[in-house]
Amino acid sequence: MQETDRDIHISDGTMNKEEQSPNNEEMVEAFRNLLLLHGHLPDKHGDHNTLRRFLKMRDFDLEKSKEAFLNYMKWRVDYKVDLISQKFKFEEYGEVKKHYPHGFHKVDKTGRPIYIERLGMTDLNAFLKATTIERYVNYHIKEQEKTMSLRYPACSIASDKHVSSTTTILDVSGVGMSNFSKPARSLFMEIQKIDSNYYPETLHRLFVVNASSGFRMLWLALKTFLDARTLAKVQVLGPNYLGELLEAIEPSNLPTFLGGNCTCSDHGGCLFSDEGPWNDPGIKEKIEEPSTIEDAHSETMDKVSENAPANQKESLGEVMITMEKYAALKTAVKDSQKRIEMLEISLHETKKVLNGLAEIIEAIQPNQPITKCKPV
């Protein structure tokens, strides 16, 4: 029986334009100022795109975004993420991919990287013999760091526009409730927690293909672990999925096992190739120049701001004025606190002098009691 029903639909929309709207861009600047005022803006990982992701994660609520961002920075320190990114070696990479086929492969029509998993071909027992959940999580973190620092910037340069999210395809042929064992649940929940809390807003859309009736029961369980924003990006398809994929991806960028034309035979298969703009030597050289992406982004945002409606510009001005007033008030409060501290010190010293004089006078006139200053 052919499955053509879809549990959840997503709209094509214009997410990239929404991300770059003047209101959102000014909110990023306000968020940066808020973190700076409290001494929470780090030298690393506090870039424009990261701040915007955490704002979107919390619907542009500054205080909630700040809390989420500070949790992220604490996690990076506690989990030693920078060390994992630089030093962790996943020697079992090839063996793991045999039992859990997955990987990045080229880009979609919008220039976003494509990530693919063939869950129906996963052999969990063999996977757990090849590695541990802890080591795989470290590998996943290292891959996420590579995506943030290399894949997205490379795709941005190649497509000449800002790219900060991924198009994902999950092939669930043959997957059902029996696949959702305790180890599978542990791995899924750990990966989901990391991605949703520390790498938010990096999913553009998710195609679940070859979904059978048996997958529906599993999907009901999986949905409980996903937030509404993620669910809105998911499209569950049966075996007649190809038309939907080809609307988003060129056949030359789609592996043959999904109905496309690509085999990556020189790399042992598409999921072993990691093929994409991030392997272009010229693009990688540009990424090493810190100004490249930021300059392109600033130029784009200048154009967006110039074309903003008058009412939007007024509201943006109000946001910035509010932040400036907040900053001025914060400075005034700190200055007042310092003055109060100085007055308290001066008053304390004055009372010490008066008490000393009282003792001298009492020594000179022992028969006349003198009341000393009470301690502060």
UniProtKB/Swiss-Prot annotation:
Coiled coil: 323-357
Domain of life of the source: Eukaryota
CDD domains: SEC14 (cd00170)
GO biological process: protein transport
Primary localisation category: Golgi
Region span, Disordered: 1-24
Cited Pfam families: CRAL_TRIO
Entries under PROSITE patterns matching the protein: CRAL_TRIO
Tagged with keyword Cell membrane: yes
Places the protein is found: Golgi apparatus membrane; Cell membrane
Domain CRAL-TRIO per the UniProt entry, residue ranges: 92-266
Composition skew (Basic and acidic residues), residue ranges: 1-20
Zinc is among the record's keywords: no
GO cellular component, one term: Golgi membrane
SUPFAM superfamilies per the UniProt record, alphabetical: CRAL/TRIO domain, CRAL/TRIO N-terminal domain
Membrane disposition: Peripheral membrane protein
Record's function text: Required for transport of secretory proteins from the Golgi complex. Catalyzes the transfer of phosphatidylinositol and phosphatidylcholine between membranes in vitro.
Protein name, as recorded: Phosphatidylinositol/phosphatidylcholine transfer protein SFH11
Protein source organism: Arabidopsis thaliana (Mouse-ear cress)
